[in-house]
UniProtKB/Swiss-Prot annotation:
Catalytic activity: tRNA(Phe) + L-phenylalanine + ATP = L-phenylalanyl-tRNA(Phe) + AMP + diphosphate + H(+)
UniProt-recorded Gene Ontology molecular function terms: ATP binding; magnesium ion binding; phenylalanine-tRNA ligase activity; tRNA binding
Family, similarity comment: Belongs to the class-II aminoacyl-tRNA synthetase family. Phe-tRNA synthetase alpha subunit type 1 subfamily.
Cofactor notes: Binds 2 magnesium ions per tetramer.
Keyword Protein transport carried by entry: no
Protein name: Phenylalanine--tRNA ligase alpha subunit
Species name: Zymomonas mobilis subsp. mobilis (strain ATCC 31821 / ZM4 / CP4)
GO BP field: phenylalanyl-tRNA aminoacylation
Pfam family of the protein (one): tRNA-synt_2d
Amino acid sequence: MTDLDNLKADLIGQISQSGDLAGLESVRVHALGKQGVVTALLKSLGKMTPEERQEKGPVIHSLRQAVAQGIADRKQALETALLNEKLASETIDLSLPSPKMPKGSLHPVSQVMDELAEIFADLGFAVASGPEIEDEWHNFSALNIPESHPARAMHDTFYFEPQEGASDKGDKGRMLLRTHTSPVQIRTMQGQEPPIRIIAPGRTYRSDSDATHTPMFHQVEGLVIDKGVHLGHLKWTLETFVRAYFERDDIVLRLRPSYFPFTEPSMEVDVGYTLEKGRRIIGGKQPDGWMEILGSGMVHPNVITACGLDPNVWQGFAFGCGIDRLAMLKYGMDDLRAFFDGDLRWLRHFGFAALDVPTLSGGVGA
């Protein structure tokens, strides 16, 4: 047996006898460290003659590979044994209580959207949706809003820059972030045969920001298209909706003449409130004051015509209100900006249980 064979046997023996990782590391440093015996042999190859290097080189490299592989195998065996020992000594007490998991809550806007869908579903309305990036035709022109209307101004509407090489105005005009959910009504009238009953909740965008306005807000609009529709149907629908939403039968509505380009006649709708300890409470047969909550009216014949329907055959009414404002009135929030701040304290206070699904039988705000 040569000296290299003896060295190999000695190192393999030390490796196999290592009882822990620290001892194995000592063997590795002794053999393969910078000053290790195997490392010294590898360095000596540079001083040998070509004949000696050809003879002893393969043997020395084989020695190094055997030692390195032995160390790796022994390390894995020691780590496995250590893990098994740890698992055997550690037990799980299944009777201990589990860590408390934080619970999320439903945002008030989501809750109100669910309440609106439940109320109007009971009245035969479907929920419709549409793109938030719209063109001028669907957002303005089809709704009888002329080019000169201030709503089309840059300071009130978020317009997109035209793509490179594209015309500033295509067939449908410039692209923009919708300023209301009315384009959903247009798309529904274009793509669906009447009669139509829909609500269109969703995000809308206007260049405005203060305690009661944000650049992005939520709106719901309703549309009915049928034969023989008149203002009495609109008034009954609004009264039924408001009383169901605020869960009070003593709510009084006041309809005031107004102007909207897309309805004729148009009306602002106020809800009566009573004062209790300085607070405004929605409801009461003898209101102490009035608060505006939504706009409404009979769909303008020009809008019906723009959607390919005959206004002499089909009539309709529409209404719209801010979902965020409805939430503020019902649940007592004071600042609209808090809806979008992401303050966990605010969300915990005003949030709703995720499984608390609104129903008319159980009370939509229960």
